[in-house]
């Protein structure tokens, strides 16, 4: 339990994610740096439970988590929307045919006032790509839904040996409220 939870404050979304990952034995975390995911990444780095790898590209992160799964270790790939845009080939040629329960946590960009046209275009294609690949995906918009969705997505991915994507809405991460770009 964190100090601020002990003091009566609610857990932050990133504290909940860390707790649920640990409860479900997800030890390996790969990520490409992202401002929205920075609070989660900082907490994960601070916790000796996790093995953390920061590859150069999201495709490498997928390969690392896939290899770890084949060796008996559970892992997750953290990325932003534009990073997901680089993954369809790796998903279609490695993850899906091999039935790898790849967990992806994606910070959603390109919506709710994001002014970067590239992010907007990628955001519009992300869910259709996930759906066309039959990858279970759910957006998390409220702190009270974090535990339920993350827990269920992890369990479902491993029970069905299928990839799963958890999309962190700006409504959850507060990016849209603070005018971040």
Task: State where each predicted segment sits.
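Thiamine diphosphate
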Residues: 1-181
């Amino acid at each position: 339990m964190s100090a601020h939870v002990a003091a009566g404050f609610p857990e932050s979304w990133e504290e909940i994610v860390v707790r649920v990952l640990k409860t479900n034995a997800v030890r390996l975390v790969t990520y490409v740096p992202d401002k929205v995911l920075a609070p989660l990444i900082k907490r994960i780095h601070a916790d000796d439970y996790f093995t953390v790898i920061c590859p150069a590209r999201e495709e490498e992160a997928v390969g690392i988590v896939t290899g770890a799964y084949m060796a008996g270790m559970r892992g997750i790939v953290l990325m932003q929307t534009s990073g997901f845009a680089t993954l369809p080939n790796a998903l279609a040629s490695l993850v899906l045919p091999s039935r790898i329960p790849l967990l992806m946590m994606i910070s959603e960009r390109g919506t709710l006032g994001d002014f970067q046209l590239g992010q907007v275009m990628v955001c519009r294609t992300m869910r259709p790509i996930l759906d066309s690949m039959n990858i279970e995906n759910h957006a998390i918009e409220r702190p009270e839904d974090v535990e339920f969705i993350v827990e269920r997505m992890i369990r479902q991915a491993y029970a069905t040996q299928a990839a799963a994507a958890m999309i962190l809405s700006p409504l959850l991460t507060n990016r849209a409220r603070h005018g971040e770009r």
